Regions:
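Metal-dependent phosphoesterase core characteristic of DEDDh/y 3'-5' exonuclease domains
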Residues: 1-132
């Protein structure tokens, strides 16, 4: 979730170095940012096999939307249905790298940067599939 990470980095930078200090200064303005969650929702989780997976194992939010977090994504790509995300830096990065690699392997176009509510891409796809 790049949006969350960028907020956390801005807050941490300000707490460490004072108000007005920036995490990414203007010299880095041309860096292309990518949100793994958005990328996964666009190219991996918007596939019939993912929709079948979440339906089969009832991996939905309370409001009936498909779960699209890293834990569910890793369960999907690894087949490890018992997997629970550690929520510890390195362990989380390791599974997110595997999700990212799987996304790149799809060789599909995707948006760069931060997409608002990437889960809604999958929810829309899921709804459209159910209406067919």
């Amino acid at each position: 979730n790049l949006n969350f990470d960028m907020r956390a980095l801005r807050t941490t930078t300000e707490k460490l170095y004072g108000k007005g200090k920036r995490f990414l200064t203007s010299e880095y303005k041309d860096i292309e940012l990518m949100c793994i969650w958005s990328f996964a929702c666009e190219v991996l989780y918007s596939r019939p096999s993912f929709i079948n997976f979440i339906d089969k194992y009832n991996l939905m939010t309370e409001k009936g939307n498909p779960l699209t977090n890293a834990e569910v994504g890793y369960r999907y790509i690894s087949g490890d249905l018992e997997f629970e995300e550690a929520h510890r830096g390195l362990q989380d990065v390791e599974i997110e790298c595997q999700i990212l690699a799987k996304c790149f392997a799809q060789k599909k176009k995707h948006e760069s940067g931060i997409l608002g509510n990437p889960w809604s891409i999958v929810a829309k796809y899921n709804k459209e599939k159910k209406e067919i």
